[in-house]
Amino acid sequence: MEIAHSINKRQSNLYLIVIILSGIVFFIPFLGRVHLFDWDEINFAESAREMIVTGNYHRVQINFQPFWEKPPLFFWLQVASMKLFGINEFAARFPNAITGIITLVTFFLIGKKHYDEKFGMIWALAMLGSFLPHLYFKSGIIDPVFNYFIFLGIYCCANWIEGKKQNGKFALLAGFLIGLAT
């Protein structure tokens, strides 16, 4: 019994490694090869750059004017990336590539929990091979980060409502995650 558990654990770890490496191979290469092209990409990267220039990380701004339309989390992630990689296209898009990898891992773990490892792997690979998510995870727009936290918040809320987690911790976590997105 112990050997079977050990083999299953190794197989699960192997699946996770394959998913993470696949995400790295699919989402990270050539992030900075193309100029920022979309209004959102350009302005979001500029907002992060302006945070660095002014040192004001509490207020999102464009052209040094307040920009209240978007929540700050994504811009903070871009700032961290720009501080690590410099102010460039790669740094503006890197947070979404990491979010893409984390999304794949999350899908695998949720699929494994509710069905089995095979389902989790198929779900993660289906997401990996889908055109629109692939495009989003290689962009510098807010949607992947926003969608990830909204998805997790709804998932936590659904578990709480179903009664799997009767205490309020899942409800609080759902609110916190949705709050991060918005």
Over which residues does each language-model region extend?
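Membrane-integral, polyisoprenol-dependent glycosyltransferases
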Residues: E2-T182
